């Protein structure tokens, strides 16, 4: 799935518009396939998780605004996709947002930790990440997973409204500001994943800086 989404992102313009991510009704994302992780095939598990971590890095650093329309439960990697987006809208309902890795016998690697620290509010980070607390949709705003909650029938209407508004933000100035804000986090993520450092285009001198 991560490889498929990565391929789709190749066709998304990165110099105009905005990126809107959503899931199916009742489920935004449940994260990695635990059966793949638990079936005892280390190669398959490593390939799947590495592709997922690279996808998170790509969404987090996408040059245009990223809007997440959480259509239901956002669990494990799904919770971290919310952390990658620039504006997060959740559908009201009996849904949870939970980073449940430590409850499932999994440690959380550096790339995900860095993303979570940049989005989860400090007074909720231990509860949300280390203690794997499940948050209701309404409580997810206070934790830092979501920015806004709306009725389910209004989710895509609101998401498109926000996406259209943020699409008007100037390029490359939005990208330049985002790059500077994320530089330290992305450097730690790319070092952990063995990815090359991404140069940053200076808005003043128009040169690339690393």
Regions found by a protein language model. Give the residues of each.
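Well-ordered beta-strand positions
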Residues: 87, 127, 131-133, 148, ...
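A structural preference for short, pocket-lining loop segments at secondary-structure junctions
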Residues: 2-40, 58-68, 87, 91-95
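Hydrophobic/aromatic residues within transmembrane alpha-helices
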Residues: 21, 33, 81-83, 140, ...
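C-terminal long alpha-helix characteristic of the crotonase
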Residues: 3, 90-95, 143-192
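Intrinsically disordered, low-complexity segments enriched in small/flexible residues
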Residues: 180-210
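A short acidic, glycine-rich active-site loop
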Residues: 39-50
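CoA-thioester-processing core
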Residues: 55, 75-128, 162
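Acidic, divalent-metal-coordinating active-site segment for phosphoryl/phosphodiester hydrolysis
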Residues: 76, 132-139
């Amino acid at each position: 799935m991560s490889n498929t989404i990565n391929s789709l992102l190749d066709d998304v313009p990165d110099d105009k518009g905005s990126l809107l991510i959503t899931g199916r009704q009742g489920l935004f994302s449940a994260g990695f396939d635990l059966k793949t992780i638990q079936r005892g095939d280390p190669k398959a598990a490593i390939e799947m998780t590495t592709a997922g971590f690279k996808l998170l890095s790509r969404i987090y650093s996408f040059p245009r605004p990223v809007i997440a329309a959480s259509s239901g439960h956002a669990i494990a990697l799904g919770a971290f996709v919310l952390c990658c987006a620039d504006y997060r809208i959740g559908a009201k309902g009996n849904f949870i947002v939970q980073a449940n890795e430590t409850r499932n016998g999994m440690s959380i690697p550096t790339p995900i930790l860095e993303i979570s620290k940049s989005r989860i509010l400090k007074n909720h980070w231990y509860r949300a990440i280390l203690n794997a607390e499940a948050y209701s949709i309404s409580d997810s705003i206070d934790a830092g997973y979501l920015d806004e909650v709306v009725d389910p029938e209004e989710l895509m209407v609101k998401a498109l409204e926000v996406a259209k508004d943020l699409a008007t933000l100037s390029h490359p100035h939005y990208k330049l500001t985002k790059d500077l804000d994320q530089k330290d986090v992305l450097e730690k993520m790319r070092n952990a994943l063995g990815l090359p450092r991404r140069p940053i285009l200076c808005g003043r001198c128009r040169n690339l800086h690393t």
